[in-house]
């Protein structure tokens, strides 16, 4: 049996995320204009993600520029959450595991 609270630290496939200590921001901003980098360059996006370390809004891996993944790699911020309405899952780019915080 897992210790209390262990379930929220495990991904949907049972793999634990080892970067939970990087989570600083959980809640989405009240309004999101779009992917910050796409807005600056005139790019387009499919879905949005929010870095849970610094709050930067980037586009998903289905988007042409994959700015959320690029940000994770360049800044070392491993975890992003979905910024889509009604979604509360997060993703660790390093451990490649999805999970829900809370």
Language-model regions, residue ranges each:
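Extended, low-complexity, charged intrinsically disordered regions
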Residues: 1-8
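Canonical RING-type zinc finger of E3 ubiquitin-protein ligases
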Residues: 43-52
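Cys/His-rich, Zn2+-coordinating zinc-finger modules
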Residues: 13-23, 29-34, 41, 57-102
């Amino acid at each position: 049996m897992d210790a209390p609270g262990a379930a929220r630290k495990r991904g949907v496939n049972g793999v634990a995320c080892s970067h939970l200590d990087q989570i600083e921001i959980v809640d989405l901003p009240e309004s999101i204009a779009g992917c910050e980098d796409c807005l600056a360059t005139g790019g387009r996006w499919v879905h949005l993600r929010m870095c849970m370390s610094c709050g930067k809004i980037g586009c998903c891996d289905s988007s042409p520029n994959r700015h959320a993944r690029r940000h994770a790699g360049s800044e070392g911020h491993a975890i992003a959450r979905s910024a889509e309405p009604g979604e509360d899952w997060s993703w660790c780019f390093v451990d490649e595991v999805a999970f829900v915080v809370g």
